């Protein structure tokens, strides 16, 4: 509200005090994001969401980087946002998409990654934490293995950055995408991180104001340096400023405390869910925020609607990971997503509500 009330101006355009204030606040958020994940400020570009970031990475960089016959490694537990852009790229270029096998617990192992690499493999695009199984992938080890074989790594961090202390330099990941709205921030703000030397090799996907230095009527254009090169048009100023405040709040609490709280709550929830005979948990031994389950004889949608009547919000369906059903052997599930604002009393209420089911 402060932005709208006191300095509601556009960014990077105004030669007046409220414009300078907007530029200062956007720079502040960029700095906070860079510090939060251990990156340089010019390696942080603002986007609309994780989906937008992944599309820009895949179609803005890899369309030029990959050649016919090059192979991309994915997994069948990826979110649509880390699959569909690759499918689109495959329509434009003669690339090959292969899938890293999942183990019996639907997890990715370094050994399975190693076995999947061929001389043609050029990129591994993988979630750090998946949004259905909730498994945390060994990204640092995968990056080390990939780089030993001259392979780049794209990381979908939508489910990990809000929950786990991340340092991109330590992980050595080449690209990382995540969203503000999963970490107490507003919708409509995403982050594209990339190593500086890679970001300078992107082709522009969206062009216009704010991302050029000069252009002339004959079509000659000089584009801005990174990260402004990725930020054409008027940005979501209010959202970006708010995201900076969200990061400050998370830092004040401490990511380690958040992770401990969520894991303790998850263990408690799983132990209580196991008391209900008709509940099947698909990711019992995972140490992240996600619990995926079904209730015997009730569709996931019907269960979610029943819980909604009691003011309990769970996600039902395929969770945008429609290929995973081939591995799970079922079409849909219910998903509980825990965060720092949840508590044991809420878990107890959920369990009692589930125990009250009669049919």
Identify the meaning behind each predicted range.
Residues 1-359:
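Pyridoxal 5′-phosphate
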């Amino acid at each position: 509200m402060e932005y709208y009330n006191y300095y509601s101006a556009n960014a990077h355009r105004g030669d007046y005090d409220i414009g300078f204030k907007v530029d200062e606040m956007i720079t502040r958020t960029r700095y906070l994001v860079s510090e939060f994940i251990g990156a340089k400020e010019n390696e942080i570009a603002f986007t609309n969401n994780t989906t937008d970031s992944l599309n820009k990475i895949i179609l803005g960089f890899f369309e030029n980087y990959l050649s016919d016959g090059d192979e991309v490694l994915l997994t069948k537990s990826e979110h649509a946002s880390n699959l569909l852009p690759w499918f689109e790229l495959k329509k434009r270029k003669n690339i090959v998409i292969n899938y890293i096998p999942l183990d019996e617990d639907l997890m990715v192992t370094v050994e399975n990654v190693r076995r999947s690499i061929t001389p043609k493999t050029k990129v591994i695009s993988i979630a750090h934490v998946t949004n259905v199984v909730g498994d945390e992938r060994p990204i640092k080890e995968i990056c080390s293995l990939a780089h030993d074989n001259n392979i780049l790594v794209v990381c979908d961090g939508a489910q990990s950055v809000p929950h786990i202390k991340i340092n991109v330099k330590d992980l050595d990941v080449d690209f990382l995408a995540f969203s503000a709205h999963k970490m107490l921030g507003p919708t409509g703000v995403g982050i594209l991180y990339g190593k500086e030397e890679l970001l300078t090799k992107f082709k522009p996907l969206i062009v216009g104001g704010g991302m050029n230095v000069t252009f002339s009527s004959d079509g000659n254009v000089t584009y801005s340096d990174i990260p402004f090169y990725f930020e054409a048009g008027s940005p979501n100023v209010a959202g970006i400023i708010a995201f900076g405040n969200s990061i400050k709040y998370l830092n004040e609490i401490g990511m380690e405390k958040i992770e401990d709280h969520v894991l303790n709550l998850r263990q408690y929830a799983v132990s209580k869910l196991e008391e209900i005979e008709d509940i099947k948990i698909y990711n019992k031994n995972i140490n992240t925020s996600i619990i995926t389950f079904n209730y015997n004889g009730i569709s996931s949608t019907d269960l979610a609607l029943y819980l909604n009547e009691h003011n309990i919000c769970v996600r039902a369906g395929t969770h945008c990971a429609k290929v995973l059903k081939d591995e799970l052997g079922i079409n849909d599930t219910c998903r509980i997503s825990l965060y720092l604002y949840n508590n044991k009393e809420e878990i107890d209420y959920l369990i009692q509500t589930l125990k009250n089911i009669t049919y």
